[in-house]
């Protein structure tokens, strides 16, 4: 099941056809703010716009349907709060309200579906994880099984970069 937030409708995207749209994935990772800052700086310098994408964590509790539904609703509410905080940050940095997308399902699959559905998304901006376990699940998926389905360039920002380093290159 997938869903596009009202503020991320195809109509709104069509209204901004001339704008370059930088899509950033919102999550609670340490490196996410780095990717978001990079997307904001690029949007600011190219008269573009930032779009934020969020998929709540799946509720694994299947024993009682009502409990699973409650867990999904709580995860969605937490995600909406996170999106609102990041949206305010994007607006502060770029002067433009970002486009918001909330989906349910597998995050990597929903990300590819979104990029297929929204032709105005110009670039996907991700930050690589800083842990020894690798760059992160989305990057690993997109560079592996998902690579053949991509039609949007990806910018991978090292998660260890600082805001000052990003500012210097953007």
Residue spans of the language-model regions?
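Small/aliphatic-rich secondary-structure junction motif
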Residues: 12-66, 149-150
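Helix-adjacent hinge/juxtasegments
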Residues: 71-99
């Amino acid at each position: 099941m997938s869903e596009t937030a009202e503020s991320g409708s195809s109509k709104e995207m069509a209204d901004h056809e001339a704008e370059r749209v930088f899509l950033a994935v919102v999550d609670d990772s340490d490196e996410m703010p780095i990717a978001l800052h990079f997307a904001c700086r690029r949007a600011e310098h190219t008269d573009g716009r930032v779009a934020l994408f969020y998929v709540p964590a799946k509720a694994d509790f299947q024993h009682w349907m009502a409990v699973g539904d409650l867990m999904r609703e709580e995860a969605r509410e937490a995600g909406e709060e996170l999106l609102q905080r990041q949206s305010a940050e994007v607006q502060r940095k770029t002067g433009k309200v970002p486009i918001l997308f909330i989906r349910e399902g597998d995050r990597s699959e929903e990300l590819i579906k979104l990029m297929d559905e929204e032709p105005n998304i110009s670039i996907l901006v991700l930050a690589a994880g800083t842990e020894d376990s690798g760059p992160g699940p989305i990057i690993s998926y997109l560079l592996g099984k998902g690579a053949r389905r991509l039609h949007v360039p990806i910018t991978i920002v090292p998660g260890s970069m600082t805001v000052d380093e990003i500012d210097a290159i953007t």
